[in-house]
From Swiss-Prot:
Its EC number is 2.7.7.7, 2.7.7.49, 3.1.26.4. The gene is P. Residues 347-690 are annotated as: Polymerase/reverse transcriptase domain (RT). Terminal protein domain (TP) is hepadnavirus-specific. Spacer domain is highly variable and separates the TP and RT domains. Polymerase/reverse-transcriptase domain (RT) and ribonuclease H domain (RH) are similar to retrovirus reverse transcriptase/RNase H. This is Protein P. It comes from Hepatitis B virus genotype C subtype ayw (isolate Australia/AustRC/1992) (HBV-C).
Length: 843
């Protein structure tokens, strides 16, 4: 007879009328009982003949592709002019005094950020914009191209001008070496002084003035430079190591654009007169530059190499035959849907190519991309705006994958210990947080996005003209692309983009100037940055609490008036560093803070309402006695795992599901197991904040017996049969908790200390989790454990009771600065201007 839910509850000791714990609990460790229960609940039955279920509620599993929805009315979000101040460390020091080592190290990491992949795979330009929406290919092409253009205009991307130069908009940083008329301009910066512009083969600045060529040779392989391109390193390697910016002006050569050939550049750029950096002059000269003048000094043409004449250098002078778009003007219409009808609407379609305000030198960058892009909804709640998805997954796959640095994410208990208090809270929203952090230009060749131009994009989609790939500029197949579909799409897009259609129909290659979202390094850098900023804020306002996770910043203060004045001060400070906040998204939470999916108040933490709603929905839709595909189980476990710490039995209750996912087998929910989980998740208990205290109850065990020291009382017992040592220690801890009621226990077992009971026999893990919920553990070495003797059957010998203090930990949550205490038992009427006198130090 299958096990009923009531019987199962009784078995797990979740009912009050269970027998004495010392007899009942060891039974749950019995392998035979665990196996029988698993069979009764149909938990481990992988061989099912019924077809698997691949969808449960909103969770989809194997063989199901979620079709993304294209929205023709997507708006491209606006990006403010984000420019993080380069002297951020000095500004912080002026604000709060000397920075700690940790804060300094973190801020140096992102000024500028560096990226060194082991291997970079270059893809053809046609793969620049992914054909994610085949029905709306042209529309998607232009919307994506507009998004990229917006990012370039906002100073977030570089535009590849030639193999060795790029242009960008916005304010330059000191590590971006300026080019004027294909010539380097040296600026002195307060950060590096003159040593920062040692000429190197790759345009990477070395930190030290000594021997940059040696460094550049070391870095060549990581930057993907071939040995023959390091011509500078080769030419100068015979000389002494110390090359300063103004030491040998006569032997100096610049490789700003193309390193090949005998073209020697005039050395006046290195003379001190041209060091003055005049932005206004540069802008005017740029606007009159034609692409013909942008040829390299060595006489090599420097436009895209692998691209047909559609983007050849002469086009901005007005030669029509170089531009695919303008060729239609002089050709006869081929039908009523010929593109020439659209192109003849305008006399002046504007420039073929736009150039940025600044031109800089970059390492050799091929006319390729390293990742594809496409658009999706900004988030599930905002479908009117688009978000750019960049696929740089090549850096986290395969044998040459980059191992991203690990960083600490606060766990639930640490978070609760830290934030559960009676403070008033508000959260700040950093707009486009990732795009605040500047990347070194040396990373550009690895992070390239772009598009091959409309003609090749359309040709790739229509298989007929795919063969004549090499002759796209020629007249005979100019009209191959004319179709009703393309004509109608372009006419509609003309309303939105106007003359820009021409600009967007040209090929372009862009590299990231700020950190992109699709690279594993970015979350790490963002976490380092915001935690350093919060650390500075905490030290500037010692009677408040500031905390961050990624781009989510929260501020807490004793009263609402205090919080408002803190908010004003912190906002002004962040804006002075160049951090853009989104004022519309500032949320005031009162006393219960919503953060990282939790609601955290003085009583502890619980999952947010929308997660509770999802849980209810999940159980409503969960089928019984039907095998569910393991991929769906993975998604169910993702949701249930988030809320597991708030249930009686915690993670151990989900172990059967974990096991089936690991074995990649289907899982069948029996009515009893579903009812058990359902009851677990419909009554959630808050996770409370741990309190400091003295440990006066100790537990210890041997495989055959257990012993407790409760104050001056000693208790011992034996097991019916010998048990594995970890199981015995866990049982002893449960007995100590149930006999004494103490919520701080001393134990010498690391597994019990870790509070992860998923590796124990299933029934025991579930029961122990419930008994030990809310218990804090202190480590006591075996030699000092007062419960050691009773566990070995010796009751007469009394070791002295230790005075073992328990201090709640906030984990590695980057609280390097001392933070104030926020004891919730203080009266609420603390005057808001008075810093509290009790300072709390992280353990």
């Amino acid at each position: 007879m299958p096990l009923s839910y009531q019987h199962f509850r009784k078995l797990l000791l979740l009912d009050d009328e269970a027998g004495p714990l010392e007899e009942e609990l060891p039974r749950l460790a019995d392998e035979g009982l665990n196996r029988r229960v698993a069979e009764d609940l149909n938990l481990g039955n992988p061989n099912v003949s019924i077809p698997w279920t691949h969808k449960v509620g909103n969770f989809t599993g194997l063989y199901s592709s979620t079709v993304p929805v294209f929205n023709p009315d997507w708006q491209t979000p606006k990006f403010p002019d984000i420019h993080l101040k380069e002297d951020i460390i000095n500004r912080c020091q002026n604000y709060v005094g000397p920075l700690t080592v940790n804060e300094k190290r973190r801020l140096k990491l992102i000024m500028p950020a560096r990226f060194y992949p082991t291997l970079t795979k270059y893809l053809p330009l046609e793969k620049g914009i992914k054909p994610y929406y085949p029905e709306h290919a042209v529309n998607h092409y232009f919307k994506t191209r507009h998004y990229l253009h917006t990012l370039w205009k906002a100073g977030i991307l570089y535009k590849r001008e030639t193999t060795r130069s790029a242009s960008f908009c916005g304010s330059p940083y000191s590590w971006e070496q300026e080019l004027q008329h294909g010539r380097l301009v040296f600026q002195t910066s307060e950060r590096h002084g003159d040593e920062s512009f040692c000429s190197q083969s790759s345009g990477i600045l070395s930190r030290s003035p000594v021997g940059p060529c040696v460094r550049s040779q070391l870095k060549q392989s990581r930057l993907g430079l071939q040995p023959q391109q390091g011509s500078l390193a080769r030419g100068k390697s015979g000389r002494s190591g110390s090359i300063r910016a103004r030491v040998h002006p006569t032997t100096r050569r610049f490789f700003g654009v193309e390193p090949a050939g005998p073209g020697h550049i005039d050395n006046s750029a290195s003379s001190s007169s041209s060091c003055i950096h005049q932005s206004a002059v540069r802008k005017t000269t740029h606007s009159h530059l034609t692409t013909a003048q942008r040829h390299s000094p060595s006489g090599h043409a420097v436009e895209f190499h692998s691209i047909p004449p559609s983007s050849a250098g002469s086009q901005s002078k007005g030669s029509v035959f170089s531009c695919w778009w303008l060729q239609f003007r002089n050709s006869k219409p081929c039908s009523e849907y010929c593109l020439s009808h659209l192109i003849n609407l305008h006399e002046d379609w504007g420039p073929c190519i736009e150039h940025g305000e600044h031109n800089i030198r970059i390492p050799r960058t091929p006319a390729r991309v390293t990742g594809g892009v496409f658009l999706v909804d900004k988030n599930p709640h905002n479908t009117s705006e688009s978000r750019l998805v960049v696929d740089f997954s090549q850096f986290s796959r395969g044998s040459s994958r980059v191992y991203w640095p690990k960083f600490a994410v606060p766990n639930l208990q640490s978070l609760t210990n830290l934030l559960s208090s009676n403070l008033s809270w508000l959260s700040l929203d950093v707009s486009a947080a990732f795009y605040h952090l500047p990347l070194h230009p040396a990373a550009m060749p690895h992070l390239l996005v772009g598009s091959s131009g409309l003609s090749r994009y359309v040709a790739r989609l229509s298989s007929t003209s795919r063969i004549n790939d090499h002759q796209h500029g020629t007249l005979q197949n100019l009209h191959d692309h004319c179709s009703r579909n393309l004509y109608v799409s372009l006419m509609l897009l003309y309303k939105t983009f106007g003359r820009k259609l021409h600009l967007y129909s040209h090929p372009i290659i862009l590299g990231f100037r700020k950190i992109p979202m699709g690279v594993g390094l970015s979350p790490f850098l963002l976490a380092q940055f915001t935690s350093a900023i919060c650390s500075v804020v905490r030290r500037a306002f010692p009677h408040c609490l500031a905390f961050s996770y990624m781009d989510d910043l929260v501020l807490g203060a004793k009263s609402v008036q205090h919080l408002e004045s803190l908010f004003t001060a912190v906002t002004n400070f962040l804006m002075s560093l160049g951090i853009h906040l989104n004022p519309h998204k500032t949320k005031r939470w009162g006393y219960s803070l919503n953060f990282m999916g939790y609601v955290i108040g003085s009583w502890g933490s619980l999952p947010q309402e929308h997660i509770v709603h999802k849980l209810k929905h999940c159980f409503r839709k969960l089928p019984v006695n039907r095998p569910i595909d393991w991929k769906v189980c993975q998604r169910i476990v993702g949701l249930l795992g988030f809320a597991a710490p708030f249930t009686q039995c915690g993670y151990p209750a989900l172990m059967p599901l974990y096991a089936c996912i690991q074995a990649k087998q289907a899982f069948t929910f029996s009515p009893t197991y579903k009812a058990f989980l359902c009851k677990q998740y419909l009554n959630l208990y808050p996770v409370a904040r741990q309190r400091a205290g003295l440990c006066q109850v100790f537990a210890d065990a041997t495989p055959t017996g257990w012993g407790l020291a409760i104050g001056h009382q000693r208790v011992r017992g034996t097991f019916v049969a010998p048990l594995p040592i970890h199981t015995a220690e866990l049982l002893a801890a449960c007995f100590a908790r149930s006999r004494s009621g103490a919520n701080i226990l001393g134990t010498d077992n690391s597994v019990v200390l870790s509070r992860k009971y998923t590796s124990f026999p299933w029934l025991l893990g579930c029961a122990a989790n419930w008994i030990l919920r809310g218990t804090s553990f202190v480590y006591v070495p075996s030699a000092l454990n007062p419960a050691d003797d009773p566990s070995r059957g010796r009751l007469g010998i009394y070791r002295p009771l230790l005075r073992l203090p328990f201090r709640p930990s906030t984990g590695r949550t980057s609280l390097y600065a001392d933070s104030p205490s926020v004891p919730s038992h203080l009266p609420d009427r603390v005057h808001f201007a008075s810093p509290l006198h009790v300072a709390w130090r992280p353990p």
